[in-house]
């Protein structure tokens, strides 16, 4: 249920996946290298240096703006945002202020009431990332901090939403949709550490706004906001004011902690960046080509592959999953569409999440082979899950992944036929072991049938066809349990 008193707006900082920094030629591939090895006089802000704008970063930002239905401003400009912090080597950040690259726009999500709704955007602007502090100990009690400027100058876009979200869950849905769109555009790599950071502004209607910083995960946004809603409501119930402030989210503890009083824009003393000309991009707009985006792909999955809307939404929510699905059903496996959608969205996704594996660890052709023998009736669904788990565990251990057919043969998982004497014997044995179930059946309790079917499935390790097994159990019960 939507909590009408909750008002949430997000400021989402996304690193653009360019090869070089925003204002210099330093590489952005810094994560596996030593500290301060991807720096130069420009990104360190040394005297006498001049920034040179990365055109590819602007093109990526414009592509995002177009995909999010924004109006691209014909002329924007960069400004200096002045504040002192150790990770800001120049003591100012080059960003955009009153003349951003794009304005307006929206992101469509499924609201908490199940209806599609538009989350309006305020603006999208381009800026440089600051460096990174490494606290020796922890941020509160460490003896000192180290500064790594490898990240300084990485191109960022900041996507600012209107305060249109009405729950922490809607905020997470907004972020998931935004992430999917950026991945489809090919401008963002969500798997890179620190590639997305969120500042969340939250208030309860009629009370002061609180900004929560230091949120670096999609789940973290929902958890941080849920904690903050509870904290603010508790203050109000006790008759205490909600103070306007900035709080940090401590992910390990799942709480927010007061950091400082919230700054106003005047505190940053913005003024135009004198070393960069105004940015005129009107002639570039016509060259922006968009790929198929998540909403369009979702609709295509419904019409082309007859996926349910829920399955299509899950499959297209991540670019890799959507590509995997189409890889599975390509060629002569078009008849597997419905089965593939169900197994990927419901079964495979859960097994991967349990093992903390990505879908790119799974070979679509091999997974398609598993679905093919399921569809042929060679194995039961329960045995299919067992085969899948063996395949994933082998992959996780770095072992050679067997084919589904080989696993079925090795573990003797082929479905037991209804005319197989072993199955009839298993039914007879289970019935003889459970006389109370026979009494319950005779008393009109049909739940006894399901119980006996389950016991036979255990005895046959899930190899019996449930429908055929149900028929055999009922026949045996009608025959007096013989």
UniProtKB/Swiss-Prot annotation:
* GO MF, one example: asparaginyl-tRNA synthase (glutamine-hydrolyzing) activity
Q: One Pfam family, short name please?
A: GatB_N
Q: Which reaction does it catalyse?
A: L-glutamyl-tRNA(Gln) + L-glutamine + ATP + H2O = L-glutaminyl-tRNA(Gln) + L-glutamate + ADP + phosphate + H(+); L-aspartyl-tRNA(Asn) + L-glutamine + ATP + H2O = L-asparaginyl-tRNA(Asn) + L-glutamate + ADP + phosphate + 2 H(+)
Q: What is its EC number?
A: 6.3.5.-
Give the matching InterPro entries: Asn/Gln-tRNA_amidoTrfase_suB/E, Asn/Gln-tRNA_Trfase_suB/E_cat, Asn/Gln_amidotransferase, Asn/Gln_tRNA_amidoTrase-B-like, GatB, GatB_C_1, GatB_Yqey_C_2, Gln-tRNA_amidoTrfase_suB_CS
UniProt keywords (A-Z) are:
ATP-binding, Ligase, Nucleotide-binding, Protein biosynthesis
An example GO biological process term is:
translation
Q: What HAMAP family does the record tag this protein with?
A: GatB
The UniProt entry's sequence similarity note says: Belongs to the GatB/GatE family. GatB subfamily.
| Entry protein name | Aspartyl/glutamyl-tRNA(Asn/Gln) amidotransferase subunit B
């Amino acid at each position: 249920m939507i909590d009408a008193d909750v008002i949430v707006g997000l400021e989402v900082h996304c690193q653009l996946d360019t090869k070089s920094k925003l204002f210099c030629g330093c590489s952005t591939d810094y994560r596996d290298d030593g500290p301060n090895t991807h720096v130069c006089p420009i990104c360190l802000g040394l005297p006498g240096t001049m920034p040179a704008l990365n055109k590819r970063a602007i093109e990526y930002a414009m592509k995002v703006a177009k995909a999010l239905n924004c109006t691209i401003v014909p002329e924007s400009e960069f400004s200096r945002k002045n504040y002192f912090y150790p990770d800001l080597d120049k003591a100012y950040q080059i960003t955009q202020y009153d003349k951003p690259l794009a304005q307006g726009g929206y992101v469509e999500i499924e609201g908490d009431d199940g209806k599609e709704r538009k989350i309006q955007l305020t603006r999208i602007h381009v800026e440089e990332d600051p460096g990174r502090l490494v606290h020796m100990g922890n941020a509160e009690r460490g003896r000192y901090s180290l500064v790594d400027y490898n990240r300084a100058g990485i191109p960022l876009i900041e996507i600012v939403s209107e305060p249109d979200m009405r729950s922490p869950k809607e905020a997470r849905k907004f972020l998931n949709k935004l992430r999917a769109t950026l991945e489809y555009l090919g401008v963002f790599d969500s798997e890179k550490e620190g590639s997305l950071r969120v500042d969340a502004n939250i208030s309860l209607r009629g009370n002061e706004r609180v900004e929560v910083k230091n949120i670096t995960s999609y789940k973290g946004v929902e958890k941080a906001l849920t904690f903050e809603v509870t904290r603010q409501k508790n203050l109000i119930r006790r008759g205490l004011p909600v103070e306007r402030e900035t709080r940090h989210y401590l992910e390990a503890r799942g709480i927010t902690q007061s950091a400082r009083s919230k700054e106003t824009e005047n505190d940053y003393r913005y003024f135009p960046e004198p070393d960069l000309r105004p940015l005129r991009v009107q002639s570039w707009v016509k060259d922006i080509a968009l790929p198929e985006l998540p909403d369009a792909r979702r609709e295509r999955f419904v019409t082309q592959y007859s996926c349910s809307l829920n399955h299509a939404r899950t499959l297209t929510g991540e670019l890799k999953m959507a590509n995997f699905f189409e890889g599975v059903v390509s060629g002569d496996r078009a008849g597997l569409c419905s089965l593939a959608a169900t197994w990927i969205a419901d079964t495979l996704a859960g097994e991967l999440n349990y093992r903390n594996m990505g879908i790119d660890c799974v070979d679509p052709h091999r997974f398609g082979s598993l679905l093919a023998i399921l569809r042929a009736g060679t194995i039961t669904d329960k045995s299919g899950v067992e085969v899948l788990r063996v395949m994933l565990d082998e992959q996780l251990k770095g072992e050679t992944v067997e084919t589904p057919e080989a696993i079925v043969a090795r573990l003797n998982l082929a479905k037991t036929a209804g005319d197989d004497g072993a199955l009839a014997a298993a039914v007879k044995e289970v019935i003889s072991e459970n006389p109370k179930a026979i009494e319950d059946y005779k008393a009109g309790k049909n739940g006894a049938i399901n119980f006996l079917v389950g016991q036979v499935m255990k005895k046959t390790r899930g190899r019996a066809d449930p429908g055929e097994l149900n028929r055999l159990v009922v026949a045996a019960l009608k025959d007096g349990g013989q």
